[in-house]
Amino acid sequence: MEEQVANAIEIAGNPTSDSTLKAQAFDYLNQLRTDPSGWQVCLSLFTKDPPQSHFIRHVSLEVVNSAAQAGLIDLRSLGFVRDRLLAYLRQVYGREGSNPDPPNIQNKIAQTITFLFSALYGNGWESFFDDLLSLTHKSPSSTTRDNPLGIIFYLRVINSIHDEIGDVLVSRSRAEQERANALKDLIRVRDMQKIASSWQEILSQWMDGDDLIVEMSLKAVGSWVSWIDIGLVVNQTMLDLLFQQLGRAQKAELREGEDKVRDAAVDVFTEIIGKKMKAEDKIDMIAFLNLDNVVGQISSSPPLYANRFTSKYDTDLAETVAKLVNTTVTDIVRALEQETVSAQCKEKANGLLQVFLPHILRYFSDEYDEVCSTVIPCVSDLLSYLRKMAKSNPSIASQHSSILLPILKAIIQKMRYDETASWGDDDDQTDEAEFQELRKRLGTLQQIVAAVDERLYMEAVSEVVATTFENMRQSGAQLDWRDLDLALHEMYLFGDSATKSGSLYNKGQPSGPSAERLVEMMLRMVESDIRSFTHPATQLQYMEICVRYSSFFHTHTHLIPGVLESFLQLAHHPMKKVKTRAWYLFQRLVKQLRAYIDNVAQTVVEALGDLLVIQAELPSESSDGDEMSSEDHEGSTDAVFNSQLYLFEAVGIICSIPTIPADKQVLYAQSVLSPVFVDMEKNLGSAKSGDARAVLQIHHDIMALGTLARGFSDWQPGTSSPATQLPAPEVSEAFSQVSEATLVALESLKASFDIRTASRFAFSRLIGVLGSRILPQLPRWIDGLLTQTSSRDEMALFLRLLDQVIFGFKGEIYNILDALLMPFLQRVFSGIADPTSGTDDEIHLAELKREYLNFLLAVLNNDLGAVIISERNQPMFDTVITTIEHFAKDAEDFTTAKMAFSVLSRMGSAWGGPDIAPAASNGPSTSQVALPGFGQFMITRFSPLCWALPATPSFNAKDAQAKQVLAEAGGLQRTIYSKMGMEYIEYLRDRELPGMGMGADLVEEYVGTLSRLDLRGFRQFFPQFIQRLSA
């Protein structure tokens, strides 16, 4: 069988094997893993002499491991595995001159031995560490650890055991953690002294020998120190050995592998300081280890001092020392923060903080961002501590300036692009993203500094900005773009402090000292020669700052023309990233400064004319497999067009400034509209013939038209009176052409989803420009937007738009709504009735149901309910009621059910006539006359619905959403009672409630409560009543 297993492993691992044979081999090996006797064959294969191939042995041992972990090997058999492997280890690792296994096999054996340790150390293998330590001698009579093969294997197992039971980063179940804790306790009692002594012996005997042995020993000490007696590591013998290894840092040249030994020695000190202990003990430990001296000596070593700013700089060592600094300072700050710590301890901690400040600054200001990032946590802790101190005692804030100022200067300097940065290169996108993430973290630290000492922060940033602009004034384009970018970035962040009161100005004056400084900075920037901003990064920053602090221009309106001119130049930037961002920022700026801009419309339209030419491009076939959507990719054609739309809106804003006469507004609008109309006409024929690019071109044209309209007026129904927000009648008339052009395209191409999407977008924007002028066209819009192929999602979105139209024009829409309601709702009913397939479909169906009910509520709440029961729409009335009844009984969709009851209550209020029962307060009032027979209709059709939903088998009356639905159902019953009075009470008493099997006493309690409580009271009562019944 061994030969058969070996053969199967060879076939499975051979890339040239026949696929059928390989599949059979994999099936066989998978069966072997679950076979209770399979591990025995594999154990024999692994220990066989002469040995099998490395691959066979690796897979064989993997099967043994798998069987052991799956519980297929009982305790007695685990002992057998132990004995076989121990014999193998003694033969291969326990004597000199044998041929060692490759590292992957050694790791696999160490993994198996670690599992056996977990299972047997407390249950039959008490000599575990003695057995392993015996491998470290060449012979039983040897008194030194002189067998390198055995030592390396022993250390592999030691480190593997820590990973299994001591590594806090490993996620374990509660049972696994309890077992790990028990094993650690057992080791501490039985063997810990012996293990610690072995580390000392190995380090002592091999300190100048095998670097791998020393490195593995140091890693073992560093990992185990977190859960063993600290005295086993922090003693003179061990510390002398550790300091000897730290001495390697002083070497200018290291042999291969020696740097890992040095770094591992530093890591041991980091782990010692990271060990959990009382704050007082930790401070004493830091002082005892003289870590200030340790860090200082390594920092001044050739790899970190002489080689700094050269290609030989050792970033690995710098990061390793930075970890030690970070851990140490974090614990120093923790001691300072604890209120229970003694004054003497705090004094010591303060002293340590002062001596460690140069080390913090050294690594925080390191040229390499990964080194700087390593100490950010301790800098954050330190600054947060100082903020807490300053908050409790503001008078001491200035005392911390000796700490704050150098940290702040380091923060500012680290925010500068380094000399190797090449901004904007596609190849450097990852580096750029990482740098921006670092800037964000540094910005957070800077804000903490500002919170501790705002004046110090204000002075430091002001100095950087003022010096930079002065240098730019003197040297112009000679200024390094990185310095200007830094100053602008600091200006951008400064606003967090300058505008914390809510705005830059208060009654025309800067809102505080920081705001005053920011105004000074803005003046320096805006009055600078834009031509000095030669780098794309600084050009972008310039625009971002102008937009962020646009309120600055409210009191410096004379600067607006120059800024607009700068933006128009940058809108033509040769770099696409800058250009498209400029389009967006230009729109933001003119929107915020609309009331302060003079008549520059003609200049702007002429300057941007070449950028308003629309050129649709179909996505390339190669982009189909790209995981990133085209809209996310700033260089994609979709993203460029989306940015271009901002220009159309900006043009609309500038052309509709109130100071421009209406006839001029029309002229400017037509200068933009006409080329788009011509383009649509030119492409319509091809689009009808199925030309995909022509369809996309018309989609883009319609989107542009709608966006231009939004620029002229962003009024939305319901926000304010249209009379005060709509453009002049002449302008509205000009945009009627937009509506007509869009409808012509939509009517020709309504089978296209993209055209419907663009048209719906344009419709929503045109409402704000046309007002009630759009109403006569509503039937055409509905016909084009709600087709046989329209999705539920499209219908829901359009229903939402119609709600706005109804709200905005309720006094003018009745006749149009009366004419279009029946065909419109028939399409909605069709969409609701269509079968669903998949989760997305279910979501869209639920959304359509809710928007349909919202639409009915909009009609009823705006006194247009008569349209539902008009002579023209009467044939559809029963279908409307039936759909609502169906939704009200849906226990799978409580949100829709709740809305359905709301609609029925609103119908009752609208058509049930005047209230005849008392205590109907806090319900919706209505002045509408009664609909003949509707009262009886409510009793027989609406009332039973209140009981149908809770009668559903899956209904849970205690569910929070279910309670909300029941409250609405209770509200409906109270509405029926308010309209029908005793007639409804008698119906409940004589027919409905007894028909459900309710006893006479319960019926009387129920109808008595209904007649006694008001609407709010009964809404609360009904869910409680249903809970009682269900219990």
Swiss-Prot record:
Protein name listed in UniProt: Exportin-T
Role of this protein: tRNA nucleus export receptor which facilitates tRNA translocation across the nuclear pore complex. Involved in pre-tRNA splicing, probably by affecting the interaction of pre-tRNA with splicing endonuclease.
Cell compartments where the protein resides: Nucleus; Cytoplasm
GO cellular component, one term: nuclear matrix
Main location: nucleus
UniProt keywords, alphabetically: Cytoplasm, Nucleus, RNA-binding, Transport, tRNA processing, tRNA-binding
Keyword Transferase: no
GO biological process: tRNA processing; tRNA re-export from nucleus
Keyword Glycoprotein: no
Higher taxonomy: Eukaryota, Fungi, Dikarya, Ascomycota, Pezizomycotina
One example GO MF annotation: tRNA binding
Any Pfam family: Xpo1
Gene3D superfamilies to which the protein is assigned, alphabetical: Leucine-rich Repeat Variant (1.25.10.10)
Organism: Emericella nidulans (strain FGSC A4 / ATCC 38163 / CBS 112.46 / NRRL 194 / M139)
SUPFAM superfamilies recorded: ARM repeat (SSF48371)
Family: Belongs to the exportin family.
